[in-house]
């Protein structure tokens, strides 16, 4: 093998590793114990996610400036009463309480809005929306970075089945 071929192979390997790193950082939801997150409600009072044990729960990490987050929350709002009536939705941000309340009051979504006491980066959430589904035992049964098409009937059925 020539030096040029070895050099090309090394460059391809390095680029592949960089690609894998970026994919894992931005497209794979970090493993986390969602029910033990430190969060506060819109009045800055601590909120215990454990209190939702026994209920199916969608935990959506969002930001008020994120178009895909807003789109996903809008879709969840549209289908909540008809198709997700037995599911609680937690909308969690790392923005200020003021921004949380402005967004909450503007959108009027029937979700529980919470603020992290840490930043997304501290939790290794590098891309939003990031969604976790919890079953009735409070266990994470699904996680995804990026927009979920909740209007797709087969996707919705699959995700609801996971929460059972």
Question: What annotation goes with each model-predicted range?
Answer:
Residues 20-49:
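N-terminal "domain-start" segment that seeds a small globular fold
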Residues 90, 101-137:
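Short, internal strand/loop/helix patches
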Residues 55-57, 61-65, 127:
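Short pre-active-site segment immediately N-terminal to redox-active cysteine/selenocysteine motifs
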Residues 61-78:
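Conserved redox-active cysteine motifs that mediate thiol-disulfide chemistry
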Residues 133-164:
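Thiol-/selenol-based redox modules, centered on thioredoxin-like
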Residues 1-5:
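Positively charged n-region of N-terminal signal peptides that target proteins for export
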Residues 71, 78, 98-106:
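Short alpha-helix adjacent to the SAM-binding motif of class I
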Residues 8-21:
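Hydrophobic membrane-insertion alpha-helices, especially the h-region
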């Amino acid at each position: 093998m020539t030096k040029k071929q070895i050099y090309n192979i090394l460059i391809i390997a390095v680029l592949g590793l960089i690609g894998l790193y970026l994919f894992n950082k931005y497209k794979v939801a970090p493993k986390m114990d969602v029910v033990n997150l430190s969060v506060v409600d819109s009045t800055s009072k601590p909120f215990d996610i454990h209190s939702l044990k026994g209920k199916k729960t969608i935990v959506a990490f969002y930001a008020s400036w994120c178009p895909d987050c807003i789109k996903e929350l809008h879709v969840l709002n549209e289908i909540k009463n008809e198709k997700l009536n037995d599911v609680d939705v937690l909308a969690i941000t790392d923005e200020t309480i003021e921004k949380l309340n402005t967004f909450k009051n503007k959108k009027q979504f029937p979700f529980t809005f919470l603020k992290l006491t840490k930043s997304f980066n501290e939790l290794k959430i590098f891309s939003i929306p990031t969604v976790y589904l919890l079953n009735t035992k409070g266990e994470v049964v699904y996680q995804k970075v990026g927009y979920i098409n909740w209007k797709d009937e087969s996707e919705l059925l699959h995700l609801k089945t996971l929460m059972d």
